[in-house]
Amino acid sequence: MPTDAPSRGRLRAASPEAIAEGAALLRAGALVGVPTETVYGLGADATSAEAVHGIFVAKGRPADNPLIVHLADPADLARVVARVSPLAAELAARHWPGPLTLVLDAAEDLPSVTTGGHPTVGVRVPDHPVARALLATADTPMAAPSANRSGRPSPTRAEHVLADLGEHVALVLDGGPSAVGVESTVVDARGTRPVVLREGAISREALDAADAEPHAAAPGSRYRHYAPGCEVRLVAPDDLPATVARLAATGRRVGAIAPSALLPAGLAAATAAEDPVALAHLLYDALRTAETRGVDVVVVATVAEEGIGRAVMDRLRRAAAG
């Protein structure tokens, strides 16, 4: 039976003792906040329907929005998938551990709640020492979407998890800020050509050797994502100073995310991001900071849609759509 989470989750530095506690909680059916290289995840035992149901309750997540299952090692794939295609084996060898999720046919005994009722499951091996140690110690596949309320900016710091889900999570392991800052790339790897379902930390360019091709959408893409409690406005870099000045003249509290040379003085919240990689790393934290500082509108300088810039612009458009 799952254990009841405390009224408020605890945050612990990710020591070996804390990791052991987190593993015990996972095995007991509780929810654990887990650092990964992309964003923090809300972890539960992927083989326990009751534990996984707790993720959907905590996040307010639609039941047909499938979860990504995390493994300690590629050798564990057989625990959650029915068949590993040659393409999946090739991509896993090249990109795991790392921010690439492979969609494959789900094993028959994997709970349908984990897959959102779909016949497939997304799987990856994270490239974070705390996540890997937790998975190895727990010795169970872990379902782990981003550890935030659905629709909110994803968490890249342990305190973000507590802010959104503190009453639902038993423990948050603090592994420091997420290194990448945007979610994994999701690829359907069942066929002979990879189909990109979601842009992410591994770029299309990095998948070119495997002939990546565009696809309409991942199952959960129709839902609201990444939106803070303030307006997000996207502008070309050269237009940012004038846009900020015009908005400020109306009396609104204005924030901005842009290269430092474009950030004017007097902003209610300012985040300098000099390139797309830096913007990916800082984006969700910057949106949350703007929100907590009472910003009415945050103006963001767009970036070129190449490399990780595609994933960044995807997240920004969704945030701006509210």
Spans of model-derived segments:
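Active-site-adjacent structural elements in enzyme catalytic cores
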Residues: 1-322
